[in-house]
């Protein structure tokens, strides 16, 4: 199954979460997203979606905002500490898994709570981690969410 992984602002392709997904057996599409401008990152992601047709889109931090800004073309969403508010992305999404930590020092957990209040199709998973979301149990939770999407 194809999974599009959209990395965060200070990350790059081939990071911990993308590697974990690949090791779990997924075909991981992991394009390099520029730091600026945001709309170019969205265009790159949309082009990959249009051409590769991934089944699941996983976005981390800024990549989560990018994932919320694209037309997923039927792909399921898994958002990791999505920085939607910082990038002015719409608060309306039909359904998604969101993994976030109340200890996040970059993207406030209250932003995820606000998303949940406005979108009842969301499943929020609170992780005992920091913003980087690299602990083994967090990586396993991300993989579990992607596995749930593939059912």
Model regions: which residues?
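Short beta-strand/loop motif that positions the catalytic acidic residue
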Residues: 97-104
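Gly/Ala-rich beta-loop-alpha elbow adjacent to hydrolase catalytic centers
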Residues: 57-68
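Active-site catalytic motif of lipid deacylating hydrolases and related acyltransferases
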Residues: 1-52
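A conserved short beta-strand
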Residues: 73-85
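Post-His helix in hydrolase/transferase enzymes
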Residues: 42-43, 111, 134-149
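Conserved alpha/beta-hydrolase "acid-adjacent" motif
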Residues: 14, 105-114, 134
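Catalytic histidine neighborhood in serine/cysteine hydrolases
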Residues: 117-134
